[in-house]
Each structure stands twice: as structure tokens, then as C-alpha cells.
Amino acid sequence: MLSIQEIMALIPHRYPFLLVDRIMELEPGVRAVGEKLVSANEPYFQGHFPGNPIMPGVLILEALAQTGAVAALSAPENAGKLVLFAGIDGARFKRVVRPGDTLRLEVQLEKMRRGVGKGQARATVADQLACEAELLFALTDPSR
């Protein structure tokens, strides 16, 4: 399990854009399972949507991407690198995510070639599928 401090040591995201609260399972370079505790205080709920708060789908995808970045960057050979989003294929949203929900974020990394990788991602709430997608990412030197 990784704490928020350990997550922040791996990825550069910070409030209000750090969307993973903890990592419960980690196989470095292979897979990660994380959680986002969705609070009524999230800044995006002010406008999405007043009186009917729903977590934007793009932020669910970003939370999945950050979980995948933790999996990739926890591998010793990727230490000190930066993970950039390179694409999304087959994204599907099956359930709304609301304040009070705990979003479970699962990412399985599949391929890595010449600094470009792919992962299968799923987000669930109470064992119900909220989102699934194939995420594409690139590993790079942060000074570039």
C-alpha cells in the first residue's frame, strides 16, 4: 500500500489535480489498484452540475491514468521519468460517480515499446463498473 506522500513522490500531480488518494495494491511496472475518495468539496462539483453533482468522466479517466503512472514509475528502470497521456481507446462510462462514492481504480499495464505503453483500466464504485478504457502513455525525461 502507498500513502498519499508516496504517490506524490512518484507522480508530479498536486491539488486540485491529484486524483488518487491511496494505492492498495502495486506490482511495479505491471499493475496498480488505487482509490479516490470522492468528496462533496471537490472543486469541479461547483459547476458539474449544480444541484446534481456528478464527477466528470474525463476526471475518472485522469484518475485511472494517474494510477497507471504510479504502476509504471514504481518500476526501478523508470525512476525519475515522467508519464504523459498519449491516448484513450474504447472509453465507456457505465455509472455516474457522486460525492461520497469511493472510486476503485485498477490499471493493468500490457505493453511497453520504445517508451510508449498501453494499459487496461477499470473504475468501479461498490463493485459496479463506472468506466473502462484502454490508456496509452509515453515515458519521457522530465527535462524535455
Curated annotation (Swiss-Prot):
EC number per UniProt: 4.2.1.59
**Record keywords:** Cytoplasm, Lipid A biosynthesis, Lipid biosynthesis, Lipid metabolism, Lyase
Can you say where in the cell this protein is located? Cytoplasm
Q: Return one GO MF term.
A: (3R)-hydroxyacyl-[acyl-carrier-protein] dehydratase activity
This protein's major location comes to cytoplasm
Looking up InterPro entries in the UniProt record yields: FabA_FabZ, FabZ, HotDog_dom_sf
Could you tell me what reaction this enzyme catalyses? Answer: a (3R)-hydroxyacyl-[ACP] = a (2E)-enoyl-[ACP] + H2O
Q: What class of enzyme is it?
A: lyase
Catalytic residues, per the record, are: H48
NCBIfam families linked: fabZ, PRK00006.1
User: PANTHER family, alphabetically?
Assistant: 3-HYDROXYACYL-[ACYL-CARRIER-PROTEIN] DEHYDRATASE (PTHR30272:SF1)
Q: In which family does this protein belong, per the annotation?
A: Belongs to the thioester dehydratase family. FabZ subfamily.
Instruction: Quote the function comment for this protein.
Output: Involved in unsaturated fatty acids biosynthesis. Catalyzes the dehydration of short chain beta-hydroxyacyl-ACPs and long chain saturated and unsaturated beta-hydroxyacyl-ACPs.
This chain belongs to the protein called 3-hydroxyacyl-[acyl-carrier-protein] dehydratase FabZ
